[in-house]
Every structure is written in C-alpha cells, then in structure tokens.
Amino acid sequence: MWVRVARFEGGTAEGLETEMARSKQVLEELGSGGLPPGLEGVTRVMEAINRPEGTGLAVIFCDTEEDMRKADEALNNMSPPAEASGRRVSAGVYEVMHDKDMA
C-alpha cells in the first residue's frame, strides 16, 4: 500500500471549513461516478485540518506504486484550493510499512 501526504498552511478556520465541505461533496460525487484521469487507482482519501493553526493534510491511498505514481502526477497538476484554505507547502509519497487497526 502507498500513500501521498500533502500539507497545506496559511488557511483560515472559515476557509478550511468551506474547503472540507466542498471536498466532501466532490468525493461523494466521484465515488458514484468515477474518478478523474490518473486517480482511478485511489482506494481511500483522508483529510484532516487544524483550525487554530490554519493547516491541513490530505492523505491519498493506493494499492500499488504504479497507481500512486499516476495519482501523484495527476494531483500535482491540479490547482491547489482557494487561498483561504491554505496553500500546498509539501507533498510526498510513502510506502506503508504497517497499518494496524488498534480498536
């Protein structure tokens, strides 16, 4: 399993809330209608925000390195979200070594 972690900084609490609502709607629509080119191999999306700091994370999961390479390329070519939700300051790809549900 592979993940891409993108970090966003410089957002406002209101801007982050707006972006998360928009993102949730887009993800729900994509889940029923297919993913954009390059993102077909994405198996899971997780987003997190820190309102007081104005930061956020987007974690994208793929099963294979090839699918992640395609997703990373597609995501790098997409426009970052609006200024109020922060700017992307980093994005990296990682191989998952351990994934254990502790519940």
PLM region spans:
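Short S/T/G/P-rich N-terminal loop/turn motif that feeds into the first structured element of a domain
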Residues: 1-57, 63-77, 83-103
